[in-house]
Amino acid sequence: MPRLYPLFSGSSGNCYYIGSAENGILIDAGRSAKQIENALAERELDIKNVRAIFVTHEHTDHAQGVRVLASRHKIKVYSSQGTINAMWEKSLINDKVDITISSNIGVLVPSVDYASCCRITVNKSE
């Protein structure tokens, strides 16, 4: 049964694992690769089972570990064109990172009253 595992949350870094012990994705990677690998291991989750990293935006508290995690473990990165461009400019990704750009991936925030509540949507036709 898929679950949500908050690994890190806050201004010092954000990262969430969604999935099971066998398969999952990361939403953001806002800490170092080592810290994220350790946080997964503490929850008995293996980085080898991470199938993708979805990056909500390019701030370092959401994207700091993307380059190392994605290149070290061959994890595909998904985000918008604007976020990918900004991450490239900030050296948060490089040519060793497998990137998919899509306008059909987004974070929906219902209203200002629910700023901490969001959902990721992915158009499966791509």
PLM features: what roles do these ranges have?
Residues I18, D28, H57, V77, ...:
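Divalent metal-coordination and catalytic microenvironments
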Residues K34-S80:
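Active-site metal-binding motif and surrounding structural segment of the metallo-beta-lactamase
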Residues M1-R43, E126:
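Conserved beta-strand hairpin/beta-sheet module of binuclear metal-dependent hydrolase folds
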Residues R3-P6, I53-T56, S116-T121:
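Short, flexible loop segments at the rims of nucleotide/cofactor-binding pockets, characterized by
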Residues R3, K76, V97-I99:
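Conserved beta-strand segments of alpha/beta enzyme cores
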Residues Q81-E126:
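Metallo-beta-lactamase
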Residues P2, L45-K48, V112:
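Structured loop/turn residues at beta-strand edges in well-structured enzyme cores
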Residues S12, S32, H59, T83, ...:
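A generic "binding-loop/recognition-motif" signal
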